[in-house]
Amino acid sequence: MEENEVKKIKQLFRKGVALALAAVTTLSVLPAATVSAASQRATITFAYCYDGNGNTIRYQQTASHNGVTFSHAGEARTRIYADGDNAYCIEPGISLHTGNTLEKDASVVWNNLGKAKQDAVNLALLYGAQGSMGSLSGTEDEKVLATQMVIWEIVTGCRNATAPYAQTDAKFYNSLCVGGANSGIAAAYNQIISGMVSHGTIPSFASGSTDSAPQELKWNGKQYVLKLTDSNGVLSKFNFTSSNSDVKVSTSGNTLTITSSKAIAGNVQLSATKKIPTVSSSAKLIAYGDPSLQDIVTGVENTAAVKAYLNVKIPYGHIQIVKTSEDGVVAGLKFQITGNGIDQTVTTGEDGTIKVKNLQPGTYQTCGTS
C-alpha cells in the first residue's frame, strides 16, 4: 500500500473515532438534562369523587367568578393530582387537563396572591385534607373537595385572608352544598373553617406576651390558690407548665387552678404551646404553574407555634406591731419574733411601730426583750 493511501486511511479512521466519541458524549449528556428538566414539572391527572354512599359528587349550581364559569349544574366533580399527589386549584374555571404538565415554583398567580392569602391557603391545607385528613369527617374525596372550596374562597377574596376569616361570598359553597346537598363536604368544610377561626385563640385569662401583669394567688388557710376560667373554651388545647416547681398547675374543664404551699419572691411565669395540626418539618407547600393553564398548589407546611403566657405572684405576709406606753416611751424598744423558722429581734421606731415583712403564713410569737 502506498504511503499516501495509508495516510488517507489513518485520517478517515481518526475522523470516524472523533465522530463516535462525539456521539457517545452527546448520548451521555442528554439523559441527565432530561431527568433534571422532568424533576421540575408535574404531570396532572384527575379522578371522579364519591360521597359516603358511593354516589358521584356533582355540582348543584352553574356559577362563575370574574366572568369565568367554574361549575355547571349536574357536572361530576373531580379532584386533581400532580404526579400522584393531592393538588388544589388556585385559578377556578381556568383550563387544565389530564396529561398537562406544570412547572414547579412557576406560578405567577401564587406569587401575586400576597403573604396574607398565601398564609391563609396554607392554614386551610393544614386544617384541611393535607394536615388533618384523619380528624375530618367524611370520605377522602369529601375532605379534599371541602379543602378545595375553602382555598377557592380565599384566593378569590370570597373569604377574608385574616382572622376570623369571614366569608364574603357564598358562590363556591353554594355551587356544591346549596340546600343541604353534599352534606359530607359541608361537614368537613365547617370543620376546616372552625379550625382556622380558632387557630390563634388562647385562653381568655392568658396573654400572647411574656410581660403581662401578674395575677395574685390568695391564701385560703392551707395554701395559696388562684382559679381562672377560660371563657374562650380552648383550655383543653393547652398544657400549662410553671417556671417554678413549687407552683403547681392543674386543669379541669375550662378552669385552670394554680397552687403553692409557700410564698415566692418575684413573679412566676406559666407558659403553654397550643396543640394544633402539624406535619413533617421537611414538608413544603409547592406552587406549580403555566401561563396558559390553571395553576395549582400541593403539600402543606407547619405554621408558627401558638403560645400563651400567664404571670402570677405569691406575696409574703407581714406583721405590724404598734407599741403604746403610759410613760410615752415607745421608741427603741426591742421585741423578739419567733415561729415558722423565724427568730428575729426587731426595734420599734419613733412612733412605736414595728413591721416585719416577707413572712410565710403561720403563727408567730412576739415578746419584749430587755
Q: Whereabouts are the PLM-identified features?
A:
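Acidic/charged, solvent-exposed loop-and-adjacent secondary-structure segments enriched in E/D, K/R, S/T
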Residues: 159-315
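Short, surface-exposed beta-strand/beta-hairpin micro-motifs centered on an aromatic residue
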Residues: 255-257, 351-358
